[in-house]
């Protein structure tokens, strides 16, 4: 596992930081921590902001 940071692409705001296996699982982990089942369950306006997960080196 690696440490990932999820940022809102439009303004660079950090939405989540934590460990995950890859970018997809980082987005899912962010959504679960916010109380959703996975990334696809997030409201459309959040997904439309195009959150981006990147590993922290």
Which residue ranges define each predicted feature?
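Short, mixed-charge low-complexity intrinsically disordered segments
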Residues: 32-57
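Short amphipathic, charge-patterned alpha-helical segments
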Residues: 26-30
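Alpha-helix capping and helix-coil boundary motifs
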Residues: 22-25, 38
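Short aromatic-glycine-(Arg/Gly/Cys) micro-motifs in beta-strand/loop hairpins
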Residues: 1-13
